[in-house]
Amino acid sequence: MSIDVTDYRDIFLNDRPLMDARAPVEFHKGAFPGAVNLPLMNDIERQRVGTCYKHHGQQAAIELGHQLVSGPVKEERIQAWAEFARTHPEGYLYCFRGGLRSQIVQQWLKSEAGVDYPRIGGGYKALRGFLIDTLESALTDCDFVLLGGMTGTGKTEVLAQLRNSVDLEGHANHRGSSFGKRATGQPSNIDFENRLAIDLLKKRAAGIDQFVLEDESRVVGSCALPLPLYQGMQQYPMVWLEDRFEQRVERILRDYVVDLSAEFQAVHGEEGFGRFCERLLESLDNVHKRLGGERHRRMRVLMEEALAEQGRSGAVELHRAWIEGLLREYYDPMYVFQREKKGGRIEFAGERQAVIEYLRQRGKSQA
């Protein structure tokens, strides 16, 4: 039988294939990038075994588990495990604590399918603990600088040009603003934290110890930043990205209208454009109170007209009206206030190429 593996660093640095034997409800609460959920027990079976354990003890629970996962059900699951193991011979299996469930899966794979497959010592809990420690050590040992700038300046594009950037919005699958929802959902908060920690782990392994982050609020959509990170972001130095108003309008038009509507149609097919319209109007309604009734009504009329024209002809030019209005009357005044508030921390300000060069040079000088 294979020895339990505890080199968690290797597992994440090399993207080892992972077979997660926990129940689906556990998996959806939090898992690791690329892990595949092939449970020993489904949610109902797990609940029944848990209730039995509570009232009748471990042995009775084990016996019930073997009754529930037997015959064709057992054969089907072993077949799925064996297929995964043969397809991914460099992978591992795990359960919550590296206990009975992964042990049973490992034993059945060996006895029923002739497959000897290693499991992770400590299971999900140990892997998760390793990533929490990874994040905490990065925050303690590394330097961070924030990238700020008004809406539409292309901060995400700048991050993509830097090898030492950490894309919080990418990990959260959200653009970070009130209009930031994507056509696909966001990860669970645990998944978000895991992705962030693995990103930092890989970059540190490549010799990077200074990171560039976009200046974000505590919550990116539904994903909350780890509190120690957010607290640090209140003190980190900042670089401010600038761009012409016209360029910002065009970038927002591309990102939040052209690309997002295409994304919705790719995901939802014929219903995609309708869902995109609903999402855009919902995003505007979410800032109703901050806009005020009159401004909200005016912007909504402009947005509805633009969406109607886009639906009829595919033309997107009318969207510029509400984009310009939102920037001038809502976002820009808010960002001007924020820049004044954070002015003492801004060590450089400039347009895209100047900011990229500054951040690259900054990384070299502090390496």
Curated annotation (Swiss-Prot):
It catalyses: 5-methylaminomethyl-2-thiouridine(34) in tRNA + selenophosphate + (2E)-geranyl diphosphate + H2O + H(+) = 5-methylaminomethyl-2-selenouridine(34) in tRNA + (2E)-thiogeraniol + phosphate + diphosphate; 5-methylaminomethyl-2-thiouridine(34) in tRNA + (2E)-geranyl diphosphate = 5-methylaminomethyl-S-(2E)-geranyl-thiouridine(34) in tRNA + diphosphate; 5-methylaminomethyl-S-(2E)-geranyl-thiouridine(34) in tRNA + selenophosphate + H(+) = 5-methylaminomethyl-2-(Se-phospho)selenouridine(34) in tRNA + (2E)-thiogeraniol; 5-methylaminomethyl-2-(Se-phospho)selenouridine(34) in tRNA + H2O = 5-methylaminomethyl-2-selenouridine(34) in tRNA + phosphate. One of its GO terms (biological process) is tRNA wobble uridine modification. Gene3D superfamilies: Rhodanese-like domain. Its EC number is 2.9.1.3. The active site is at C95 (s-selanylcysteine intermediate). Keywords: Selenium, Transferase. It is an enzyme of class 2 (transferase). Residues 12-136 form the Rhodanese domain. GO terms for molecular function: transferase activity, transferring alkyl or aryl (other than methyl) groups; tRNA 2-selenouridine synthase activity. Belongs to the SelU family. PANTHER family: TRNA 2-SELENOURIDINE SYNTHASE (PTHR30401:SF0). Monomer. Involved in the post-transcriptional modification of the uridine at the wobble position (U34) of tRNA(Lys), tRNA(Glu) and tRNA(Gln). Catalyzes the conversion of 2-thiouridine (S2U-RNA) to 2-selenouridine (Se2U-RNA). Acts in a two-step process involving geranylation of 2-thiouridine (S2U) to S-geranyl-2-thiouridine (geS2U) and subsequent selenation of the latter derivative to 2-selenouridine (Se2U) in the tRNA chain. This is tRNA 2-selenouridine synthase. It comes from Pseudomonas fluorescens (strain Pf0-1).
